Amino acid sequence: PETRTFDRPMQVEGYAPANVGYLGGDLKGVLDNAQYIADMGFTAIWTTPIVDNPDEAFTGSRYPGRGPGGDKGKTGYHGYWGVNFFEVDEHLESEGLTFADFTRRLRDEHGLKYVLDVVCNHGSPAWTMPEDQPMFGELYDADGALVADHGNLHPGALDDDNPLHAYFNREPGLAELADLNEDNPDVLEYFVAAYSQWLEQGVAAFRIDTIAFMQHAYWKRFSDRIRAQRPGLFMFAEHFSYEATAIAEHTWPENGAISVLDFPGREAMNSVFADGTSYSELESYLHLESGLYQNPYELMTFYDNHDMDRMDADTNGFIDANNWLFTSRGIPVVYYGSEIG
């Protein structure tokens, strides 16, 4: 059928062929290769979100065709289109391996911690569908009850008197995603409850997606509530900006004391190790004594990840990049595959 989730090739002019469906990756696959990761000296694994996503490919889009700017024809294989944040997506668990089993075996058999990818800003694509599709724009609770439904409506058409619309903002956010209202206390309660139960199943740290799309006050409340249950829990976030002054605010205690992925560092490393600029560029992002970050040594450092092109360096450039990554300040994060250059 048109909306099957497996093996959906996508061809966009000017881009390499891609596939937007599920291709079989699951928790068992990660566990089967965990020792390979541990043998390289890594101590933790971060995957994209594990929560339940819609079962079909999205049929709507404000954008023409299937270009990089639109989600038409794509599935939630990546995990960022959550509809039930209390449930594991059915593509990930397998017979004899629940998520709790997975984190326990990572820890006990391979010495690896698991980092959970946290999304509070949005749910799944929620509007522009020719006909409303199951699960899209919906949220379910721990009992499987429907608590929010966008109804395939433009955000501006949502009804203030409809309790199923109360979770959503009235202005569009990212693409056609259901944009969640951080000013609604029920949204905070939903996510605190959801992510607390994943801590009970062996999660060791949080990586927070799209942190800049929600107010600092929300993240302060969220982090306080979560750390009341797990004191000292390490959290780091994605604020996709190359301006240190922008991303540093998240690390301050009054904003939740959440570390960040070091995008300014990524920019400097690509400039030096891929483009061949002066090594002096590397000093600009460290901020060891500027006081900009609450603790610069807790920043997550990287030279590429799943949201961007891989670093295009030659062999010596990759060797130098990894030498720098693993010996300079911060906590190194390596995107799978980059370990071989």
Predicted regions located by residue number:
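Active-site-proximal helices and loops of the catalytic beta/alpha 8
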Residues: 103-104, 108-111, 131, 193-200, ...
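Substrate-binding/active-site clefts of carbohydrate-active enzymes
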Residues: 1-201, 221-229, 234-239, 245-246, ...
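Active-site glycine-centered loops adjacent to acidic/histidine catalytic or metal-binding residues
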Residues: 117, 337-339
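Conserved residues at the C-terminal ends of beta-strands
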Residues: 48, 88, 209, 214, ...
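Active-site rim elements
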Residues: 17-23, 181-182, 207-212, 308-316
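Active-site neighborhood of divalent metal-dependent phosphoester/pyrophosphate hydrolases
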Residues: 120, 303-310
